[in-house]
Amino acid sequence: MKTTAWTIGDIHGIGPEIILKTFDESLRSTGQPEEKPIVIGSAEALLYYSKRLGLSIDIRTIDAPEKAAAYPQGVLPVISVGEPSSPLQPGTISAEAGRLSMLAIEKAANLCLEGRCAAMVTAPIHKEAVARAGYPHTGHTDFLADLCATDNPTMLFRDPVSGLMVALATIHVALHRVPELIRSMDMSAFFSNLNRSLQSDFRIEQPRIAVLGLNPHASDGGVMGREEKEIILPCIDALADRQNIEGPFAADGFFGSGKYRNYDVTVAMYHDQGLLPFKVLAFDTGINVTLGLPLVRTSPDHGTSFDIAGQGRASHRSFSEAAKLAWEIAFNRLMEHS
């Protein structure tokens, strides 16, 4: 299978550090990196952080992913999308760092769409740095949707330790907009696409899907909102003969009682409804997967952590798990179409 592309993220955050630690750990544990990666970003930034971390990784610049095969397993190949014009300043917001992080994503996505890379794993970007660079996007998900000309990709979060998976019906939007988006979205298509992705990407033959309500107590029969009765429940009923889907459940009791363990995936109506319990349960190991794209993309479920950038304190566990999952999903898709 082809190589995976790891994007460097914001060069003033922990992205370069967790990439280097993941690569170094893989070399020390197996003698070779399992995912056979290339890094898309800045060779200078990787060399800078490698020195700060006291690592002796052999970093080489290449101009095409196919050239990575010519190097020994211990070499970390890098495709540069640009180099910083001034000394690196870990923990600071920079338009240049934002621009380089987005250029890396664009390059990796294009390599995947061209069939030259099997998957992409993205290190964290900083939203303010991206905005300063002139990009209107709020994160990876909507940027990749534009690059892939795809409508409404799904954010899914997975904990490889417990198996917990949470999908979001809406993503990075202000809370006051959630009800209108729930009413305007094609919820039936959302659930059908989610079901299909779980089958193809995770090899779950009959996914068990739990759906949370939007309102407190799932509105208690319409006392605290009408979205459950008018939108969510009719959609679940219409799909029940084709999918293993149940709900809507009150979010607090659902997670508090551990009922989520009875399902393959839980669908939350908005960002914090799903991510708050997920991060409590899987802060160090959680992975973000973007479903509904014509490419495989995973990422660690954390941000740039500017407060510890460049200090050698960042945990690479989530990125390492994201790299493993990207390889697994790419393999599953390859087998499905072989």
Curated annotation (Swiss-Prot):
* SUPFAM superfamilies noted in UniProt: Isocitrate/Isopropylmalate dehydrogenase-like
Q: Which EC number(s) are documented for this chain? A: 1.1.1.262
InterPro entries attached to this UniProt entry: PdxA_fam (IPR005255)
| Places the protein is found | Cytoplasm
Q: Where does a divalent metal cation bind?
A: H172, H217, H271
Q: Which GO terms describe its biological process?
A: pyridoxine biosynthetic process
Instruction: Provide the binding site for substrate.
Output: H140, T141, K279, N288, R297
The protein's UniProt keywords, in alphabetical order, are: Cytoplasm, Metal-binding, NAD, NADP, Oxidoreductase, Pyridoxine biosynthesis
Which reaction is catalysed here? 4-(phosphooxy)-L-threonine + NAD(+) = 3-amino-2-oxopropyl phosphate + CO2 + NADH
Pathway stated in the Swiss-Prot or TrEMBL entry: Cofactor biosynthesis; pyridoxine 5'-phosphate biosynthesis; pyridoxine 5'-phosphate from D-erythrose 4-phosphate: step 4/5
**Cofactors that this protein relies on:** a divalent metal cation
UniProt main location, coarse:
cytoplasm
- What family is it from? Belongs to the PdxA family.
Q: How does it assemble?
A: Homodimer.
What does the further note read?
The active site is located at the dimer interface.
Name of the protein described by the UniProt record: 4-hydroxythreonine-4-phosphate dehydrogenase
Q: Which gene encodes it?
A: pdxA
